[in-house]
């Protein structure tokens, strides 16, 4: 059973690696619409906020770039999700490999 699970994990890791190769431009952050006068929703503008290397930043975004930035943010979220899955699977793979090599140890 463990050997079978190890092979499943290896196949899943290979699929994750392939998916990572297909990720295009990416950028962390959240894109929000702000208003100069929030009560009347007047003076709308876009901004992106993100934290990188423990430093928080906020930048204004032109309307024509909103669509591209949404794609880049989605790519970054996908990247982070895939990396997390890879790490979880790698830990499980390591544990199973050690159990198969020495079944006496739990």
Language-model segments: what does each one mean?
Residues 1-106:
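A positively charged, amphipathic N-terminal helix/segment that binds anionic biomolecules
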């Amino acid at each position: 059973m463990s050997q079978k699970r190890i092979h499943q994990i290896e196949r899943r890791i290979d699929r994750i690696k392939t998916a990572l190769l297909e990720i295009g431009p990416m950028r962390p952050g959240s894109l929000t619409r702000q208003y100069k006068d929030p009560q009347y929703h007047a003076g709308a503008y876009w901004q992106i906020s993100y934290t990188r290397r423990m430093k928080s930043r906020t930048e204004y975004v032109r309307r024509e770039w909103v669509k591209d930035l949404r794609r880049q943010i989605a790519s970054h979220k996908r990247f982070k999700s895939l990396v997390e899955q890879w790490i979880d699977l790698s830990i499980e793979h390591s544990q199973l490999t050690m159990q198969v090599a020495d079944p006496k140890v739990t």
